[in-house]
Amino acid sequence: MSVDFSSERVCYVHCSFCTTILAVSVPYASLFTLVTVRCGHCTNLLSLNIGVSLHQTSAPPIHQDLQPHRQHTTSLVTRKDCASSSRSTNNLSENIDREAPRMPPIRPPEKRQRVPSAYNRFIKEEIQRIKACNPEISHREAFSTAAKNWAHFPHIHFGLKLDGNKKGKQLDQSVAGQKSNGYY
């Protein structure tokens, strides 16, 4: 996959939380709009206006010390500024260390583990039951049998019980001709 560099600009952004250098590729059409970037290392969200930053960082001559432009807790350096000398990156990291205290990154909420569905619980228990009765059956065959058992027993879907329940017995008898020993 090739990237057309004539339609976009690659810039380097320092994360204000973990000081990781991020390569940001921005289309020229979006240069003067506010861009949000997420750090892949610490998941910190960085908001910056790359067009304004590029204009301000490219104005001074290359031989002068690099003065990073700060926009919403980020610093931006263009490719030619980073490549000009190792001294400029050292000055940049020193300036970041001297700045105001850092705010903690905005982290997404943790995902809660969901309770397994009735279908998943039934299939798991049914596979275990089938394999206990016939240990030589493959997992694939046991799953297929368990899925058929789920499909052909409507009382399972609705949570009806067979113990003394007249309706449950009627439902069980309606599929009795299709099964042997209660299971496929």
From Swiss-Prot:
Highest taxon listed in the record's lineage: Eukaryota
Record-annotated membrane-spanning stretches: none
Chief localisation class: nucleus
Record GO biological process: abaxial cell fate specification
Subunit structure comment from the entry: Interacts with SPL/NZZ and SPEAR2.
Function comment: Involved in the abaxial cell fate determination during embryogenesis and organogenesis.
Protein name: Putative axial regulator YABBY 2
Originating organism: Arabidopsis thaliana
